[in-house]
Amino acid sequence: MALRSIKSIAGSCLCSRQRRCGSSAAIFPEGIFRCLSPKFGQEFPE
């Protein structure tokens, strides 16, 4: 469930939809990636 994923990674970094966030990333309806790992704690501009 997308909602469960959002809750589980709340506060994680946001990544550009064109960038890879690492091995663990979830695609959201907005079309952005949210990194699941805190070590990818950077934001990439579009």
From Swiss-Prot:
Any Pfam family the entry gives: SEHBP
Primary location: nucleus
UniProt key word Cell wall biogenesis/degradation: no
Cellular component aspect of the GO annotation: cytoplasm; nucleus
GO terms of biological process kind: regulation of transcription by RNA polymerase II
Example GO molecular function: histone binding
This protein's record includes keyword Transcription regulation: yes
Localization (cell): Nucleus; Cytoplasm
Domain of life: Eukaryota
Keywords: Cytoplasm, Nucleus, Transcription, Transcription regulation
Summary of the function given for this chain in its UniProt record: Plays a role in transcription regulation.
Subunit structure: Interacts with histone H2B. Also interacts with chromatin-binding proteins HMGN1 and HMGN3.
Misc note: Encoded in the 5'-untranslated region (5'-UTR) of ZNF689.
UniProt protein name: Transcriptional regulator SEHBP
Protein species of origin: Homo sapiens (Human)
